A protein has these predicted regions:
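Bacterial Sec-dependent N-terminal signal peptides
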Residues: 1-29
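Short S/T/G/P-rich N-terminal loop/turn motif that feeds into the first structured element of a domain
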Residues: 24-113, 117-266
Length: 266
């Protein structure tokens, strides 16, 4: 069972972003988000990948009360077409560690026969390459966030922007920008800002924007421009504000677009 436990702990460490209904009433309290980036095994027959992950979600993830949110994101426009992100959300750091024991118990209950359990996890493991990376983030509700309000079972577009903090500037300017622009943009269905807690780069600041379609993502830029001009109608005021806000970041950022798997969402 040690092997299975280690595998699943790795898979259960996964970003971004999530519509966590349980946290809707605690928007001011940061949560922990684990992100595991895995890679599809392109040599394997992946036709049952979704069915297998759905079974695991139904029998394990959905029943683990310490996991308060989950997402699986698949490549849409990213640098690696094999990329699959597994995202889990917890109330605190301790729950990340404790959830492993609960997951182990749920696995034994779902597949009590050891031989059947081995068959299932061998199949699940076959869908992925033998490499992954782990990151842990904390949500940043003080700069503003927007919870997803939909029961739709259609996949959404998840645009992830990874920026680098300069460790200069003042966060109040980004909070003001989000309040006047991001949170007022009706095309942005949800917005989740996160900051690095554990992983490769302590400067990383990650934002997840959810849209109904790629068309909405493209049109949202025009809406942002409209809201910016309404919030700072004078060009001099606008320039002064953005000069201050831009000090927060190094200027480097990366863009990633994914589809989510709505039936495996918690």
């Amino acid at each position: 069972m040690k092997t299975n436990k280690t595998l699943m702990l790795g898979m259960l460490i996964f970003t971004f972003l999530l519509s966590v209904k349980a946290q809707a009433q605690e928007v001011a309290k940061p949560v922990f988000i684990t992100v595991t980036t895995m890679y599809r095994n392109l040599e394997a027959d992946g036709k049952d990948w979704r069915k297998t992950e759905q079974e695991y979600f139904d029998k394990v993830t959905s029943k683990n009360d310490l996991i308060i949110g989950s997402e699986i994101l698949t490549h849409y426009y990213t640098a690696n077409s094999a990329e699959i992100l597994h995202v889990l959300v917890y109330k605190n750091w301790d729950d990340i560690e404790k959830s492993g024991d609960i997951t182990d118990d749920l696995i034994k209950k779902a597949w009590p026969d050891e031989a059947a359990r081995k068959v299932f996890f061998d199949k699940q493991r076959s869908y992925y390459m033998n490499k992954h990376s782990d990151e842990i983030y904390t949500s940043q509700p003080f700069v503003g966030s927007k919870e997803l309000k939909t029961d739709s079972k259609n996949p959404m577009i998840v645009y992830v922007r990874k920026s680098h903090l300069s460790m200069k500037g003042e966060a109040k300017y980004y909070k003001e920008f989000n309040e006047k622009v991001t949170l007022k943009n009706p095309l942005i269905k949800a917005y989740y800002p996160h900051r690095h807690a554990w992983g490769a780069d302590g400067r990383e600041f990650l934002e997840a924007f959810l849209y109904d379609s790629m068309s909405d993502l493209e049109k949202s830029r025009e809406k942002d421009d409209e809201l910016i001009k309404a919030a700072w109608p004078k060009e001099t005021d606008r320039k002064a504000f953005f000069d201050e806000m831009d000090k927060i970041f190094t200027g480097f950022h990366g863009d990633y677009i994914y589809h989510n798997e709505p039936t495996m969402k918690k």
